[in-house]
């Protein structure tokens, strides 16, 4: 069965500009401004983006930001820690929602 995700499709990202150039341009300007150096340096922002990409399980962003981090000099150890933080937060959310099971058990008793 073919995968929904095909890394070569990432190159088609800009095609959205053909259907709504104004909105695409606004998004790209906002994105560029968000990712440039500010209170956080660009390397840190790429690391955050990588962690978020893993947390939301978005394969195109995982692919893109894995490469961007490597090109920015992010070490494998830094990437591993960032992804581990994302996993901990995601896992913590699952555990936090366990309270719903507790509430259901309380209602049943």
Residue ranges, per PLM feature:
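Acidic, glycine/proline-rich low-complexity segments that act as flexible tails and inter-domain linkers
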Residues: 1-44, 97-109
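Residues in soluble alpha-helical coiled-coils and helical-bundle/repeat scaffolds
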Residues: 18, 39, 56-57, 74
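Amphipathic alpha-helical segments within well-ordered protein domains
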Residues: 32, 49, 66-70
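Short, solvent-exposed positions on alpha-helices
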Residues: 42, 60, 77-80
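Alpha-helical scaffold segments that form or flank carboxylate-/histidine-based iron centers
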Residues: 45-53, 82-86
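Short, thiol/selenol-centered motifs that function as redox-active sites or metal-ligating centers
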Residues: 48, 52-64
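Iron-sulfur (Fe-S) cluster-binding segments and ferredoxin-like electron-carrier domains
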Residues: 64-78, 102
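Short Fe-S-cluster ligation motifs
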Residues: 84-100
């Amino acid at each position: 069965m073919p995968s929904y995700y095909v890394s070569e499709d990432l190159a088609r990202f800009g095609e959205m500009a053909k259907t709504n150039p104004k909105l695409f341009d606004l998004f790209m300007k906002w994105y560029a401004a968000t990712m440039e150096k500010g209170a956080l340096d660009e390397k840190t922002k790429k690391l955050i983006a990588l962690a978020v990409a893993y947390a939301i399980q978005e394969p195109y962003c995982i692919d893109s930001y894995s490469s961007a981090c490597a090109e920015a000099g992010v070490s494998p150890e830094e990437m591993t820690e960032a992804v581990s933080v994302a996993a901990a937060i995601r896992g913590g959310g699952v555990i936090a929602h366990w309270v719903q099971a507790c509430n259901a058990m309380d209602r049943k008793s």
